[in-house]
UniProtKB/Swiss-Prot annotation:
GO terms for molecular function: ATP binding; lysine-tRNA ligase activity; magnesium ion binding; tRNA binding. It catalyses: tRNA(Lys) + L-lysine + ATP = L-lysyl-tRNA(Lys) + AMP + diphosphate. This is Lysine--tRNA ligase. The gene is lysS. It comes from Mannheimia succiniciproducens (strain KCTC 0769BP / MBEL55E). One of its GO terms (cellular component) is cytosol. Mg(2+) 1 binds at residues 413, 420. The keyword Glycoprotein does not apply. Belongs to the class-II aminoacyl-tRNA synthetase family. Binds 3 Mg(2+) ions per subunit. HAMAP family: Lys_tRNA_synth_class2. It is found in: Cytoplasm.
Length: 503
């Protein structure tokens, strides 16, 4: 019999024993009580009393009620040391026969298994090894776990299982719990920052008749009552700008977007973003906001502006570099033979792209080719926080043209570690120019560009009522969480990432 078959037999055998224990509990009455009330968390007790010596604890006679999942246990005759884990951390219990009512230790405590959830009332004391411990006087089994934890709870190392059964990952891996606490702090910190700046938080439609605000392939669904196809939103941008037209001059939305595209270490089809819009501001103001926000998050979450990530350390305390797309291509493409003249002539740009092995789509003009060259030769070099600016108008259909060079826009993307983290620009508020750019997007879509934008006539109508000078930005929450948690994959920071169906 193979080792795997033996393991499966042991697993099913242990489940059978646990079910028998549950049946015995049912026979006694309520097998899943809900009367125990906890008054202390493990980490709070450690914070308060780890430095208190044993004699002082004894004098204080501190009574506590703790609850959590059994992580480890070791029995020595008439006493058992148990470690339980709650949302804050772990604490040790000392459960001895002589400290409990008659029969409780032999009938109840000895039947407990790893993974069971228990409630304990007792007093704090220090062991001979000076470990803070709860001496149990009352015990109660709150939930009987029927399935044993992975590898007797020595850890859960299989990556796919960690993603598919996140609850097991959270039980067994402290680092995963820390990651999602950091994610929560990122979201809370962003919300606090914008509310503190006078922005109001809003919610705009997830189901849209016209999916706009970004170049991406949408998910399509059908509304039965209205008998129309609808789309899961790819971005809230066009609705948020309608609100600025309506007089909400500082507005943000922190919510989900959906894009029917590939899955990778950086991409999940369902993801979280903050998008915000500020009237009477331009893209320079938003770059300043972004630097300020990221410094605040770093200090609040890590206590320093130095952010370690993999082999890198990012310094959020320094001003972020600012460089145009053309300058970045010239700077980092020189070793590949790219020269300035290649970026201003369509035929030369096509030839340069071909040398780099870039497959040019029929719908691409000069701007799209320059962008593809940038992605090939320069993007991965933008390691320290860098604002990439002056994107071609062709690939920026919602951004305001630059006053000095209308071929490019007042737009920026934030790159950290060679990855795009955010995208923002001074908004296009010329309704006629916007209509023309939508028409160009429609032509690109007709030519086979699946990610070209749909035309939104109602948005153009809104612009015709007058959008004040405005700038807006979107920041990827998942990628920020990756950054602050030092997580290598986007799946590590999404509680339940998209996975291929297993069956």
């Amino acid at each position: 019999m193979s080792e795997q078959q033996n393991a499966e037999l042991d697993f099913h055998g242990e489940m059978a024993v646990r079910r028998e224990k549950l049946a015995a509990l049912r026979a006694k009455g309520n097998a899943f009580p809900n009367t125990f009330r906890r008054d202390a968390l493990a980490q709070d007790l450690h914070n308060q009393y780890d430095e208190t010596d044993g004699e002082q604890l004894k004098e204080k006679d501190l009574h506590v009620a703790v609850a959590g999942r059994i992580m480890t246990r070791r029995t020595m005759g008439k006493a058992t040391f148990i470690t339980i884990q709650d949302m804050s951390g772990k604490i040790q219990l000392y459960v001895a026969r002589d400290n409990l009512p008659e029969g409780v230790y032999g009938e109840d405590v000895k039947s407990w298994d790893l993974g069971d959830i228990v409630g304990i009332k007792g007093t704090l004391f220090k062991t001979k090894t000076n470990e803070l411990t709860v001496k149990a006087h009352e015990v109660q089994l709150l939930t009987k776990a029927l399935r044993p934890l992975p590898d007797k709870f020595h850890g859960l190392s299989d990556q796919e299982t960690r993603y598919r059964q996140r609850y097991l990952d959270l039980i067994s891996n402290e680092e995963s719990r820390r990651t999602f606490v950091i994610r929560s702090k990122v979201i809370a910190g962003i919300r606090e920052y914008f509310i503190g700046k006078g922005f109001i938080e809003v919610e705009t439609p997830m189901l849209q008749v016209i999916p706009g605000g970004a170049a991406a392939r949408p998910f399509v669904t059908h509304h039965n009552a209205l008998d129309i196809d609808m789309y899961l939103r790819i971005a809230p941008e066009l609705y948020l700008k309608r609100l600025v037209v309506g007089g909400f001059e500082r507005v943000f939305e922190l919510n989900r977007n959906f894009r029917n595209e590939g899955v990778s270490v950086r991409h999940n089809p369902e993801f979280t973003m903050i998008e915000y819009y500020q009237a009477y501001a331009d893209y320079h103001d938003l770059m300043d906001n972004t630097e300020e926000l990221l410094r605040k998050l770093a200090l609040d979450i890590l206590g320093t502006t130095i952010v370690p990530y993999g082999e890198y350390e990012f310094d959020f305390g320094k001003p972020f570099e600012r460089i145009t797309m053309h300058d970045a291509v010239i700077k980092y493409g020189a070793e590949k033979g790219i020269v300035k003249e290649d970026l201003y002539d369509l035929d030369r740009a096509k030839a340069a792209a071909a040398k780099l092995g870039i497959e040019i789509q029929k719908s691409w003009g000069l701007g799209s080719i320059v962008n593809a060259i940038f992605e090939e030769v320069a993007e991965h070099h933008l390691i320290q926080p860098t604002f990439l600016m002056a994107h071609p108008a062709e690939i920026s259909p919602l951004a305001r043209r630059n006053d000095e060079n209308p071929e490019v826009t007042d737009r920026f993307e934030l790159f950290i570690g060679g990855r795009e983290i955010g995208n923002g620009f001074s908004e296009l508020n010329d309704a006629e120019d916007q209509a023309e750019r939508f028409d160009a997007q429609v032509a690109a879509k007709d030519a086979g560009d699946d990610e070209a934008m749909f035309k939104d006539d109602d948005f153009v109508t809104a612009l015709e009522h007058g959008l004040p000078p405005t700038a807006g930005e979107g920041l990827g929450i998942d990628r920020l969480a990756m950054l602050f948690a030092n997580a290598p994959s986007i799946r590590d920071v999404i509680l339940f990432p998209a996975m291929k169906h297993k069956g």
